Structure formats: structure tokens, C-alpha cells
């Protein structure tokens, strides 16, 4: 549910859609906000200014993967996971959920909740193949990856791949050719390679240690590199890291010391630039004495031959969550859970500058966002 002040705008002829999941149950002690429905918002990133064009109530979660939304390449539907649900016995501590929902985007101004099915508990990252025929969901609490076939905007369970106890997959991502996928296991600190043959998904047996608390990943458009985050760092350094993996050999190409809590990693649509969302130890509540001292960070790197070189950075907000690029890589959007906003930045290849005209308020806490070109 959006803030009352937000007016839904008509959709332009060249809509560039982003789908954002918003969590209405994440409450903090002492705040005045109250429980509200989870929701999914549809934004037009091509509009000037960027605006919300539609919304629908649907299960969603802020605590969990920022890759909890996947949008079909033709922008006709989206899939949204919910890692948590409201806990009536203890409203300040939601419990694990297993929901996976399909959102119809045929009329973006009037999105519809078509279906909600179950994966495993703590349903986190979701990935959709480019053909839009198979979806994979990481079930963190179960240590498994669930597969669903997709036809006519409907999910049908197609089995699961068990990674094992103590793996806790937080994310999963398809390679561009759809024949492989990679599970990102938080507890194991590993990538697990999966083979995809139609609707049959199996482990290849190839694994790679990337770092502590491996969280999320994205693959370059040519399928060569996988870029992933490690909240607990790599090796002796416990600072959050970003690793680049060569998928030809499943070996580490480089490790970059990124900063505190790399929450989300995302590629520009041309695959040249890598943006990293850093929560950076910023406060989650305005009552925190550190509220005005520490904020989140955006860092943008150029990817060259498997290595990352920082080219720009900017301060962001508090409790930073998911992010998205626009189609031509000139705008970056950041979800701010504490402020309950989505904010925008302009990127020219060398600088990243806040555009205060792009500030969209939400009633629920934004938690995940994706476009058709996100992954």
C-alpha cells in the first residue's frame, strides 16, 4: 500500500516497468507505524518524473533477499517471494514464510495477483529464465532450490534440488543460456552449480567457496562472469566483499573489499557497470543517536576482465535494500526501508549524483525491486 500522498499516474506509451515488493509487517519498537498489508508496486522508470503507476496487495518481505522479485523479459508478469509473514504472537518478530506469487502486468496500472503457491520456508531469491518458462526459488530454511514451470502466467511445481543442511541458500540465478543456474548459499559461503534440462534441475557437483555469508548474485549478459556478495567478507578480511567468478572454470577471478553489509549487487543492462548497495551500518530508526552520522552507500564499479574498479560512489539512506538500473544505465534507484522511500541517482559513467526529484514515498517498507533486465 502506497502512502496516501502518492497519486497513481497514467502509463506512457513506452513504459519501462520496475516491480517493487513492500513489507507492511516490519515494525520497530517505539515507532508509530502500524501493521498494514504487504504490497507490490509497479513503477514506470521511463516516465519523467519516475512514478508509481499501479499497486496490488500481495505477500512480500523486506527481511530476505533483495532479489525476491523477478520480471519477465516481455514485462507481462512478475514473480514475488515472501520470506516472512506476520507473527500474531510477537508482532515485532515475523516468522518464516514460503509464499511465491505471480503478478499480472498486462495492465500495469491495474496489476493483479494471479496465483500464490508454496516453496520451502524462508522463500528468498527468485530467478526466471529468459524464455519465461522456468522459475527457481531459494528456500533458505530448507537448504533447497524449488523449481516451477511457468505457462500462461501460472506456476506449477516441478520438484526441488536439496543442497543440504547448513547451506541456507539465500539466492539463485540463471545463466543467460538457461542451461545452468547458481545457488548462493549463506551458511556454506558457496556457489552451487545447477544443471537445467527442461524442467529438470540437478546439481552438477561443482561448488566454489566465495566467502562468509554469501548473499546474492548476478551473471553478465555473455554468461562469462558471476558477481556475488559476501556479507562476512572473504578470507581473513571480514569486511563485506564482492567476488567475480569465471563461469568457464568455476574459479574466483577477483575479490573486492566493498564495505559493511553489501546488501545487493546489480549489473547495468550492458553488463559494463556493477552497482553495490552497502547498508554501511546505518541506523534503522530515527531514534537511534547515529541516525544523522551514518548512512548507506552506493558504489559503482566498472567490470574489466573479471576485475572491478570503482568509478563512483554516493551516500544513500538508512536500512538500504534493493536497487535497480534503468534500461540505458543512466539512472539507479535505491529502496530505503527506514525512510520508506525509493530514491534516484543519475550516473554518467564517472559520477553518481542524487536526483532529489526522484523521491517516491511508500507506506510499507520497500524490500526488493526488479526490472525485466535486472537478471
Language-model segments: which ranges?
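Gram-negative bacterial Sec-dependent N-terminal signal peptides
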Residues: 1-13
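Predominantly soluble domains enriched in secretory-pathway, periplasmic, or organellar proteins
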Residues: 11-375
Amino acid at each position: 500500500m502506497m502512502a496516501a500522498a502518492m497519486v497513481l499516474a497514467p502509463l506512457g506509451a513506452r513504459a519501462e516497468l520496475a516491480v517493487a515488493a513492500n513489507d507492511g509487517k516490519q515494525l520497530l519498537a517505539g515507532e508509530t507505524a502500524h501493521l498494514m498489508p504487504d504490497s507490490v508496486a509497479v513503477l514506470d522508470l521511463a516516465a519523467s518524473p519516475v512514478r508509481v503507476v499501479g499497486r496490488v496487495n500481495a505477500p512480500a518481505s523486506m527481511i530476505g533477499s533483495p532479489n525476491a522479485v523477478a520480471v519477465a523479459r516481455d514485462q507481462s508478469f512478475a514473480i514475488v517471494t515472501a520470506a516472512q509473514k506476520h507473527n500474531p504472537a510477537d508482532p515485532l518478530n515475523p516468522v518464516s514464510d514460503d509464499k511465491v506469487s505471480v503478478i499480472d502486468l498486462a495492465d500495469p496500472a491495474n496489476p493483479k495477483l494471479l496465483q500464490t503457491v508454496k516453496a520451502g520456508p524462508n522463500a528468498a531469491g527468485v530467478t526466471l529464465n529468459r524464455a519465461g518458462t522456468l522459475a527457481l526459488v531459494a528456500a533458505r530454511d530448507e537448504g533447497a532450490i524449488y523449481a516451477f514451470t511457468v505457462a500462461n502466467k501460472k506456476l506449477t511445481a516441478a520438484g526441488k534440488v536439496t543442497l543440504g543442511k547448513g547451506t541456507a541458500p539465500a539466492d539463485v540465478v540463471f545463466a543467460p543460456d538457461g542451461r545452468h543456474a547458481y545457488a548462493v548459499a549463506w551458511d556454506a559461503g558457496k556457489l552451487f552449480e545447477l544443471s537445467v534440462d527442461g524442467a529438470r534441475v540437478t546439481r552438477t557437483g561443482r561448488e566454489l567457496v566465495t566467502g562468509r555469508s554469501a548473499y546474492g548474485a548476478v551473471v553478465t549478459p555473455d554468461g562469462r562472469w558471476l558477481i556475488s556478495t559476501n556479507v562476512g567478507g572473504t578470507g581473513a578480511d571480514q569486511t563485506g566483499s564482492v567476488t567475480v567468478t569465471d563461469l568457464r572454470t568455476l574459479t574466483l577471478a577477483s575479490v573486492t573489499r566493498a564495505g559493511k553489509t553489501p546488501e545487493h549487487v546489480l549489473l547495468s543492462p550492458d553488463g559494463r557497470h556493477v552497482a553495490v548497495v552497502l547498508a554501511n551500518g546505518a541506523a534503522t530508526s530515527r531514534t537511534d543517536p547515529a541516525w544523522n552520522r551514518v548512512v548507506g552507500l552506493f558504489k559503482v564499479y566498472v567490470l574489466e576482465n573479471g576485475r572491478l574498479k570503482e568509478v563512483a560512489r554516493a551516500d544513500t539512506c538508512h536500512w538500504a535494500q534493493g536497487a535497480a538500473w534503468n534500461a540505458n544505465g543512466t539512472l539507479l534507484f535505491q529502496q530505503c526501508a527506514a525512510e520508506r522511500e525509493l530514491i534516484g541517482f543519475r550516473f554518467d559513467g564517472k559520477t553518481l549524483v542524487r536526483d532529489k526529484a526522484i523521491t517516491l514515498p511508500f507506506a510499507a517498507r520497500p524490500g526488493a525491486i526488479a526490472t525485466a533486465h535486472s537478471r
